[in-house]
Amino acid sequence: MRLRLIANPNASGVTRPLVDAVARRLSEVAEVELRLTDGARHAIALAGEPGADVVVAMGGDGTVNEVVNGLPPGAAMAVVPAGATSVFARQLGLSRRTLPAAALVAQAIRSGSQRMVGLGLANDRLFTFSAGMGLEAEATRVVDEERYTRFDGRRPGDLKVVAAAMRTLRNDGFALPERMTIELEGRSIRCGYLAVANQHPYTYFGRLPVRTAPRAGFETALDAVVVGELRSRDLWRL
């Protein structure tokens, strides 16, 4: 069994000793090739290189997304969470702690345990658990810019994301006009915010789950959350 461990050294909480500890744990069940990312989209290229039976993403949800989009046909994927939120890993039932999660991954590889996970596609890019348009997309864009200008490449905390969303709402007078038109089940709908969920909960705010699409699941079709008008007070009700 050949395993490629792709680790993001800029993920929150990631240190080289932790990466080495995960590599040692996985080497108990497979031949491990360790690769470190050095920037955005690098994990896509690393995941796509031939020669691995299993590709393990170690980092946050951004690293997971890149590995998913680079994964070659026939290769399996595993996740070792090491980011600030690690939504996908938590939705899979993995521990939030990196080393216990690595132990579960090693156990699954040893036993040959696998799980099929349905994916979504937006703008020719796969996503694992959610895709947001409108407010969420703009807040994420702002946070990603600040990540490299103010936070040395590490993802800001959840409060920074909320602050970015509030600034976006403030710029629109604390209301999002219906700027988008979507086609959903044969109907044309105008909306100010759209979220597509592949699993429940949609995301987490620290330890608290954000419950927007409680019927979503990896084994079912995608769920859409459509909001016609959104004000700042509604953020806490989502």
Label for each model-derived stretch:
Residues G62, G83, M133-G134, Q199-H200, ...:
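Alpha-helix/helix-capping structural signal
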